[in-house]
Amino acid sequence: TNIDLSEIISLISYDQALTYQLLKAANSAYVGSVSRITNVQEAAYFMGKFKTLNLLLACAFGSKLRNTKLPAYEEVEGQLWRDSVIASITAEQCSKVFRLRIPPETACAALLLNAGKVILSRFISDEMKRYISERRLSGRDQIQAELEVLDTHYVELGGIIAEHWGLPPEIAIGVKYQHDPDKVKKATSDVTHVCYRWMEFLSSPASSGNGEIKINPNVIQRLQPSSKAWFEVMQTLVKERYQKVCGDYGLPEQWLLPKQWAFDERGNDSMNGAACA
């Protein structure tokens, strides 16, 4: 990989907020620490390079993402942050519901799945946005519409950004192939595909009857679910962890709750299970 742990430690050591968050994470019951950790170097080595990198990315972009809204993608303020956090949490929890070993870089890749959206939203013209919207209305999905108008799309651009930043190759692969994991058949891109579909599922209106998560069946076969109830287990794990993260950031548990969860909170069954498509 292109990033050394000592470089990450150097970045964190001179930032009070990052140092606090790293020490807090390393000493938390969630990580499973058995003894108190008191310095950045010890905390980083204890957590490992990729968990530390994930924390660095989350802290560096968290406040910006919470205040960002993307009208071009019909996303309200905070939705980009929410989806990025849920994607990263989903990647972390995949090791609990799938038998295949999940690479440690995967949570970092999941956190950056929508990075390309931010770039496109800033630099494409209103006219191009209108053309994309027209193609969406005619039945294309977001990626097809962008490809027809721009000859690229936000997923491909996100992969290029990850490569440009010098992030580990597995992270770039996870970002770039989230939509088409069969092209590379890597565990990282298989998991980010699950994360991509998970965000799509949670953001869809539950009242519309769309209570299934549509995942490439080849991905499920490669990841090897540990039980037939993997979807329900994942739903519970991700929801509980997301609410804890909201608490850590001082946000209400119901803050910007995904539509599927909000619907379920009202006493309706929105978890119909997983579908392969």
Predicted stretch roles:
Residues 126-137:
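Post-HEXXH active-site segment of zinc metalloproteases
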Residues 1-127, 142-217, 255-265, 276-277:
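Conserved alpha-helical "signature site"
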Residues 3, 39, 75-76, 140-142, ...:
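General structural signal for secondary-structure boundaries
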Residues 213, 217-277:
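Terminal helices and disordered tails flanking the catalytic cores of nucleotide-processing hydrolases
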